């Protein structure tokens, strides 16, 4: 691989990982596991039924499916750019798998945020039906009302996993499965904490400084 830098974004749903990845996409290739899983969910495959069942119940999708998605994405991505892994790994098993298959160093950024902020953000979230770009009815709508900034589509939808009851289940699952990664990566001196309660602009400045490529 010719990749110069890999940033791993981990944190609860709604912590702003996807927003920051989009803002950095000029210099980074983005692998958004959540976005890929939603694409799989909308496909006409047996795998789609499995993914849909887990996402609708607020649980993590099984690692055998998620790991396969990441490996395929790494094979097909533009390796002349640096990479952001958005939302992966989500548990210790996936973290071990990533280190075995990546075979190069990376930095882990943990987006730390209050549960109340997550609930407020996700309950107002919508996405473009055509390209999947995420907006928020409370603070981040398209520049032209009703028209996606990226693909000019006028079709938007509420995501199935952004229902309040499902959000709470996702947070519980995250705390159980993903929080142990903090100690895992802290012990390897890979971990940097990001206060995701801050403004988008302040978070972006910190990530740019950490990356060292701006």
Swiss-Prot record:
GO terms for cellular component: cytoplasm. Residues 32-61 are annotated as: NMP. Keywords: ATP-binding, Cytoplasm, Kinase, Metal-binding, Nucleotide biosynthesis, Nucleotide-binding, Transferase, Zinc. It is an enzyme of class 2 (transferase). GO terms for biological process: AMP salvage. SUPFAM superfamilies: Microbial and mitochondrial ADK, insert 'zinc finger' domain, P-loop containing nucleoside triphosphate hydrolases. Its EC number is 2.7.4.3. AMP binds at residues 38, 59-61, 87-90, 94, 159, 170. It comes from the Bacteria. It is found in: Cytoplasm. Pfam families: ADK, ADK_lid. Pathway: Purine metabolism; AMP biosynthesis via salvage pathway; AMP from ADP: step 1/1. It catalyses: AMP + ATP = 2 ADP. Residues 124-162 are annotated as: LID. Gene3D superfamilies: P-loop containing nucleotide triphosphate hydrolases. ATP binds at residues 14-19, 125, 134-135, 198. Zn(2+) binds at residues 128, 131, 148, 151. The keyword Aminoacyl-tRNA synthetase does not apply. GO terms for molecular function: adenylate kinase activity; ATP binding; zinc ion binding. Consists of three domains, a large central CORE domain and two small peripheral domains, NMPbind and LID, which undergo movements during catalysis. The LID domain closes over the site of phosphoryl transfer upon ATP binding. Assembling and dissambling the active center during each catalytic cycle provides an effective means to prevent ATP hydrolysis. Some bacteria have evolved a zinc-coordinating structure that stabilizes the LID domain. Belongs to the adenylate kinase family. Catalyzes the reversible transfer of the terminal phosphate group between ATP and AMP. Plays an important role in cellular energy homeostasis and in adenine nucleotide metabolism. Monomer. This is Adenylate kinase. It comes from Orientia tsutsugamushi (strain Ikeda) (Rickettsia tsutsugamushi).
């Amino acid at each position: 691989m010719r990749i110069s830098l890999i940033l791993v974004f981990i944190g609860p749903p709604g912590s702003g990982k996807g927003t920051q990845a989009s803002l950095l996409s000029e210099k980074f290739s983005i692998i958004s596991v959540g976005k890929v899983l939603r694409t799989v969910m909308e496909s006409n495959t047996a795998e789609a039924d499995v993914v849909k069942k887990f996402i609708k119940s607020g649980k993590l999708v099984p690692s055998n499916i998620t790991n396969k998605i990441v490996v395929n994405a790494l094979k097909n991505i533009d390796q002349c750019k640096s990479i952001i892994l958005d939302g992966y790994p989500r548990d210790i098993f996936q973290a071990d798998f990533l280190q075995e298959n990546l075979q190069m160093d990376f930095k882990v950024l943990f987006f730390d945020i209050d549960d109340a902020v997550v609930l407020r953000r996700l309950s107002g979230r919508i996405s473009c039906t055509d390209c999947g770009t995420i907006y928020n009815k409370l603070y981040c709508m398209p520049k032209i009302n009703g028209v996606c900034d990226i693909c000019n589509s006028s079709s938007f939808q509420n995501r199935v996993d952004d229902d309040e009851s499902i959000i709470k289940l996702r947070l519980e699952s995250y705390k159980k499965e993903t929080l142990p990664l903090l100690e895992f990566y802290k012990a390897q001196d890979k971990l940097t904490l990001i206060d995701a309660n801050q403004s988008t602009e302040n978070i972006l400045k910190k990530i740019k400084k950490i990356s060292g490529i701006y």
